[in-house]
């Protein structure tokens, strides 16, 4: 049985000190949602076979509740809850007794049965301004002496126009002045909760992608896809939200003009890695955080999904913060310590945070930016272009990771550009 502790990846900061080290993301029995499961079906099943399978599940579950599991209660009595269809991947969540789980694991249509997992948010603390990260995007990784150093940010004025960034997170304050009306509410998977951001993380991430002051792609649209609320979630909600995003991108004909950001990480969980991989095969790019364990990211989800763009965090002087995960699965390094962006609590609120949650949206913003300035026909082309622009061999203590930092390619362009101060 695989266990997961899954978190959004921002870390607290104390003025005058380096960012404190995060608590390791540890998995344990308390992470499992008792009686609740994610069932992955084998590929190639027809709609009729899936329909018949669900009828079989309902019949077996009902019989088990009346017989073997007569004492079952709570979520175990729910049966099938939600179905997820991502490209050709079919999964469903449900509440089942142990006997039904045993029956499911032996069913010829079932690939795997995993316990659903709790998903936890990381602690955050408000801190003063830091704007070095944007300047880093256009400076070819030029280090600065202090995180408070202001650096010019040069960029093509298309700046993500016409592109959609989907933020699977805690929601977004779409009325924040930084978004200038370019943020919209998409999907809210959390029952009986408003589609607002009470935690701040999603608004912060969206601001790095597309805020008018703090954003990489200052004209991109951002879509709030809420799978977290105030501290925890489960794959039941995360998969529902990711499924909605993939469907919305596909139905809106936005595959070459959309990017998904996942500033989340936890122990390896194959069903969600599979979902990210299927989205890639469907023609959709996903950018993910490497994680804040200070360990090899190959053991984290969704960082370990083979065709996600996995992002580690770098400091202003080109060192790897000790919290950032590393390893061969990390594709690129981006600013991730003392980064200022939008926040909860008001339409002008800001916060300065650290973590690979901040690094990932820098690259998601770059993807949106490049989609608006270049004709990138597929997620493979997106990844190739992002990596082709990187500057090599700058990160100190990158361990065995590919050593390449993010760059937007602006210095090679031959026309007058606006500047951000």
From Swiss-Prot:
Key words, A-Z: Glycoprotein, Hydrolase, Protease, Secreted, Serine protease, Signal, Virulence, Zymogen
Q: Please report the stretch or stretches of sequence annotated as the Inhibitor I9 domain.
A: 36-122
Q: Sorted alphabetically, which CDD domains does this protein's record hold?
A: Peptidases_S8_PCSK9_ProteinaseK_like
**Any one annotated GO CC term:** extracellular region
Question: Do the record's keywords include Signal?
Answer: yes
Catalytic residues, per the record, are 169, 201, 357
Q: Where in the cell is it found?
A: Secreted
- Source organism's superkingdom? Eukaryota
* Cleavable signal peptide: 1-16
EC number(s) from the headed UniProt entry = 3.4.21.-
Q: Which GO molecular-function terms appear in the entry?
A: serine-type endopeptidase activity
What broad class describes the main subcellular location of this protein?
A: secreted
- Enzyme class of the recorded protein, top EC level: hydrolase
Q: Which residues form the propeptide?
A: 17-122
Annotated InterPro entries:
PCSK9_ProteinaseK-like, Peptidase_S8/S53_dom, Peptidase_S8/S53_dom_sf, Peptidase_S8_Asp-AS, Peptidase_S8_His-AS, Peptidase_S8_Ser-AS, Peptidase_S8_subtilisin-like, Peptidase_S8_subtilisin-rel
State the protein's purpose: Secreted subtilisin-like serine protease with keratinolytic activity that contributes to pathogenicity.
Q: What is this protein called?
A: Subtilisin-like protease 2
Q: What is the source species?
A: Trichophyton equinum (Horse ringworm fungus)
Organism phylogeny: Eukaryota, Fungi, Dikarya, Ascomycota, Pezizomycotina
